[in-house]
Swiss-Prot record:
<feature type="transmembrane region" description="Helical">
    <location>
        <begin position="562"/>
        <end position="584"/>
    </location>
</feature>
<feature type="glycosylation site" description="N-linked (GlcNAc...) asparagine">
    <location>
        <position position="601"/>
    </location>
</feature>
<feature type="transmembrane region" description="Helical">
    <location>
        <begin position="733"/>
        <end position="753"/>
    </location>
</feature>
<keyword id="KW-0961">Cell wall biogenesis/degradation</keyword>
<feature type="transmembrane region" description="Helical">
    <location>
        <begin position="705"/>
        <end position="725"/>
    </location>
</feature>
<keyword id="KW-0328">Glycosyltransferase</keyword>
<dbReference type="Pfam" id="PF01644">
    <property type="entry name" value="Chitin_synth_1"/>
</dbReference>
<feature type="transmembrane region" description="Helical">
    <location>
        <begin position="873"/>
        <end position="893"/>
    </location>
</feature>
<keyword id="KW-0843">Virulence</keyword>
<feature type="region of interest" description="Disordered">
    <location>
        <begin position="1"/>
        <end position="136"/>
    </location>
</feature>
<keyword id="KW-0808">Transferase</keyword>
<feature type="transmembrane region" description="Helical">
    <location>
        <begin position="832"/>
        <end position="852"/>
    </location>
</feature>
<dbReference type="GO" id="GO:0005886">
    <property type="term" value="C:plasma membrane"/>
</dbReference>
<dbReference type="Pfam" id="PF08407">
    <property type="entry name" value="Chitin_synth_1N"/>
</dbReference>
<dbReference type="InterPro" id="IPR004835">
    <property type="entry name" value="Chitin_synth"/>
</dbReference>
<dbReference type="InterPro" id="IPR029044">
    <property type="entry name" value="Nucleotide-diphossugar_trans"/>
</dbReference>
<feature type="transmembrane region" description="Helical">
    <location>
        <begin position="618"/>
        <end position="638"/>
    </location>
</feature>
Length: 905
């Protein structure tokens, strides 16, 4: 259907047709996917699919997608051998029944998981003989003489897995029969129709309403499958809509949705994930070309429409009947970048290359590993459909807690879970009410494509270092350190530029119904490294938005929106100021609470608690010194050590600060109890308004202040969580947060600010890409530019696919990463230990000599006498050392004079 992305309507359906805050979509009741119990692969395909012309001496593959290699799969055949991947003794489906008389026995070694990925990319040699060597060659004409774009037949098992109603409806296309590969030898900005590049959805004249992007760095196949499979399930939710004012008009719903996977470099990619994508049909080994006629390939682009999916537990999902639980066809684009050029560059391929050709209305961004909940992507899209001025939105991201919440036993996971929950309950709704959500997380967010086109994307892509030469001083290499840190939180820049876009009134929103799960760091080193980027980036981006707030006046926002944006400006400014002084504030809070509880007052009859009038001041003093010592230790560590190189020191720091904070919480509880020993009526006067205010905020008792603290710090969190109908984090995660909240400042912020200079940019080459085959150009019969390559037989494709599926569906074994400290880490660790010993030794000396807290114990002399005696010791010691030096001088002088008399010429 014809579609103009710049119009204010969806092909004639006004964006405001549906009332805001409600949905008129009627979703069918959805059953839970029983991945392990479903008959996943129980429908075979034609036995004579190889055709009558198959050579009689050619061994025919016994493989079909009716097999399952996962433990407990229902399609396992009886009487199979014990050599399967499964834990229950299952085998490789039909291969388990091959006997000695089978025409094509395959030993286990044929499926060596260590088989080199690079070797599989090499083209088979042309020539005679059996096997792959007898394959024919074909000549591929380059588009406009420079663009290599080839259609490759997909394995028979993939092709035959497509349901007949879809295969027959698209019989005039090669969508389900062939995978399309394009070697992009250009910058993303030059990936245009004018330069000969194109994508299948546009070639088939389809309107793309929803472009779902999954960005990938080096995640394993379980994380990728988790995101891709649940994305396909979300697409099924949309396709199964019964009553819709949009999706059921103008063609099938699945043709309006495109899933785009962008991999950030060949070297960093886990090659097992490529096997998963090959099983789905959107990738094949032996296809990619490292260059075309000597021009380096920048990105390898694969396209295919598939109904297959692989679950996170390595189950293969394919259509089994005509039921609504079958996955619909999903149009996929897989962009494998040759080099690791960072996430911003991946988004440039998404928006500037693919987005400009497909012209989608809404782009949803996901990170590999994020698990969108059912109907979440639909909820995000509905937000845009119901609000024509919505430029961007995000859903609720919560931490993945493991089966039965077992990860909550890890304090770091619990703390992050509470942080995510409170952000979703209090922070995001507040900012959404203002119309400007300061950050839409790149792991789970959505943008209206025409809203971010222009200046928002231009400013956003200034952080792409591949553009640094072209942009000059405006590029990443020409930026000062402040701007470089700003691009560590590049999503915040895009949000601000979108809301401040000149002449427009786009706003941002938080959509509660859209939910996504993501993994969080479970170790101290990973947690610190992640927060270093987040804290520095968010601080710089926040200052950028505050300093450039004046650009809001050039936008098209109405006076009411501008009023609330000014309120948000004041709110953000105050928060930034508190964050700046938080290090000192935490120390002052700690010391004040210790003094309030730990110092006896003879006049009022108040005694020190909990160790008595004698012991409490000493314990408090030691804890205060320990607190300061570990704060100084954080500065020493942060100025030179990697978190992974000082893992145990950081763990000890978390424990020490947690111990001190726990002690402070106990003292605070004691203060509350002591404050309310006196009846509240005696502390706060209700005689008049002035009397109430004076006694509540300025009275000698602490009752009013403590009430305010209890309500704002604890009460509001509980009330909001219960009103949100999600209070459980207040019970299992909030206690951890109370104990470890000081570490957010004393460890995370100290490390972040001390590593403000650490901005990791730069491209990494691809060693594996160097070994890939090239596309050599020749002249054809009509003098056109062509590339000659081997054309594989269908039997060869199917045979290789067997091994691919075996690798993809093999149970995942997580390899424990052994962090090997390099030589420099060893040097830095020694340096740190040396400085710590030197610094703490001097601090200990000062404490022992000058502290008056030891006087009450009767240990030795009072502090004043200790100082005097230490001063005397210094004088005598200095005198003795000086005399020793002088006597040494005399000895040297006399010896030299005597030896001079007896020396020989």
């Amino acid at each position: 259907m014809a579609y103009n992305g710049r119009d204010q309507e969806y092909g004639g359906h006004a964006l405001q047709d549906l009332p805001a805050g409600s949905s008129q979509y009627h979703l069918p009741p959805q059953e839970n996917d029983e991945e392990q119990g479903r008959g996943l692969l129980n429908s075979g395909y034609e036995q004579d699919r190889l055709g009558a012309r198959t050579p009689p001496d050619r061994p025919v593959s016994a493989y079909s997608l009716t097999e399952s290699y996962a433990p407990g799969a229902s399609s396992a055949m009886p009487g199979q051998g014990p050599t399967g991947y499964g834990d229950t003794g299952g085998s490789f489906g039909q291969f388990g029944n091959l006997d000695a008389n089978a025409p094509f026995p395959r030993p286990d070694s044929a499926f060596d998981p260590e088989d080199s990925w690079v070797e599989r990319q090499q083209q088979p040699q042309m020539g005679g003989g059996g096997g792959l060597g007898r394959s024919k060659t074909r000549k591929i004409k380059l588009v406009q003489g420079s663009v290599l774009s080839i259609d490759y037949p997909v394995p028979s098992a993939i092709k035959n897995a497509v349901q007949p109603q879809y295969r027959d409806a698209e019989s005039g296309t090669e969508e389900f029969h062939k995978m399309r590969y394009t070697a992009a030898t250009c910058d993303p900005n030059d990936f245009t129709l004018k330069n000969g590049y194109d994508l299948r959805p546009r070639m088939y004249n389809r309107h793309t309403e929803l472009l779902i992007a999954i960005t990938y760095y080096n995640e394993d196949k379980v994380l990728l499958a988790r995101t891709l499979h649940h994305t396909m399930q979300n697409i099924r939710d949309i396709v199964n809509l019964k009553k819709s004012t949009f999706w059921n008009k103008g063609g099938p719903a699945w043709q309006k949705i495109v899933v785009c996977l962008v991999f950030d470099g060949i070297d960093k990619a886990d090659k097992n994930t490529l096997d998963v994508l090959a099983t789905v049909g959107v990738y094949q080994d032996g296809v990619i070309k490292k260059d075309v006629d000597g021009k380096e390939t920048v990105a390898h682009i694969f396209e295919y429409t598939s109904q297959l999916s692989v679950t996170p537990n390595q189950q293969l999902i394919r259509p089994t009947n005509e039921g609504s639980q079958n996955l619909p066809p999903v149009q996929m684009i897989f962009c494998l970048k040759q080099k690791n050029t960072k996430k911003i560059n991946s988004h440039r391929w998404l928006f500037n290359a693919f987005g400009r050709i497909l012209n989608p209305e809404v782009c949803i961004l996901l990170d590999a590993g994020t698990k969108p909940s059912p109907r979440s992507l639909l909820a995000l899209w509905e937000g845009f459909y119901n609000d024509k001025d919505l430029g961007g939105a995000c859903g609720e991201i919560h931490a993945m807690l493991g089966k039965g919440g077992k990860k909550l036993f890890n304090p770091l996971v619990a703390v992050q879970n509470f942080e995510y929950k409170i952000s979703n309950i209090l922070d995001k709704p507040l900012e959404s009410s203002f119309g400007y959500v300061s950050v839409l997380p790149g792991a789970f967010s959505a943008y209206r494509f025409r809203a971010i086109m222009g200046r928002p994307l231009e400013q956003y892509f200034h952080g792409d270092h591949t553009l640094s030469k072209m942009l000059g001083k405006k590029g990443i290499d020409g930026m000062n350190i402040f701007k470089k840190n700003m691009f560590l939180a590049e999503d915040r820049i895009l949000c601000f530029e979108l809301v401040a876009k000149a002449g427009q009134k786009w706003h941002l929103s938080y959509i509660k119904a859209a939910k996504g799960e993501t993994d969080v760091p479970e170790g101290a080193a990973e947690f610190i490294s992640q927060r270093r980027r987040w804290l520095n980036g968010s601080f710089a981006a926040t200052l950028y938005s505050l300093m450039h707030f004046g650009r809001m006046y050039k936008s098209g926002h109405n006076i009411i929106r501008m009023f609330f944006l000014h309120i948000q400006l004041i709110y953000t400014t105050l928060n930034t100021m508190f964050a700046w002084f938080s290090l000192g504030s935490y120390w002052l809070t700690t010391s004040v609470i210790m003094d309030l509880v730990g110092k006896p007052n003879a006049t009022s009859g108040v005694h020190a608690w909990p160790f008595g009038d004698t012991g409490t001041p000493i314990v408090n003093a030691l804890l205060q010194y320990l607190y300061l010592a570990f704060v100084m230790l954080q500065f020493i560590l942060a100025l030179g050590n990697r978190p992974k190189g000082s893992k145990f020191t950081y763990i000890a720091s978390f424990m020490v600060f947690g111990l001190i904070q726990g002690y402070i919480l106990v003292l605070s509880a004691y203060l509350v109890v002591r404050a309310f020993d006196t009846p509240i009526g005696d502390q706060i006067s209700f005689a008049s308004t002035d009397a109430f205010l004076n006694s509540f905020f300025g009275g000698s008792s602490a009752g009013g202040v403590i009430l305010v603290a209890l309500i704002t710090i604890y009460g509001l969190n509980f009330i909001a969580s219960f009103m949100y109908l999600d209070p459980w984090h207040m019970f299992h995660s909030f206690p951890y947060y109370l104990v470890l909240m000081s570490t957010y400042i004393n460890i995370l912020m100290v490390y972040a600010f001390n590593n403000w200079h650490d901005v990791s940019w730069g491209t990494k080459g691809s060693d594996k890409a160097e070994a890939l085959p090239s596309a050599h150009v020749t002249k054809g019969e009509k003098n056109e530019v062509v590339v000659e390559e081997v054309e594989k037989e269908q039997e060869d494709i199917d045979s290789q696919f067997e091994q691919t599926v075996r690798r993809a569906l093999a149970p995942f074994k997580e390899e424990e990463e052994v962090e090997k400290a390099d030589v420099e880490d060893g040097y830095k660790s020694f340096r740190t230990g040396l400085v710590v010993c030197w610094l703490f030794g001097n601090i200990l000396l000062i404490v022992c000599i000058t502290s008056t807290n030891f006087d009450n114990l009767g240990w030795g002399e009072p502090a004043t006498e200790r100082k005097a005696h230490y001063f005397q010791f210094l004088l005598y010691a200095t005198a003795v050392l000086s005399l020793v030096r002088f006597f040494g001088f005399l000895w040297f002088l006399g010896r030299t004079g005597i030896m001079c008399c007896f020396s020989r010429n």
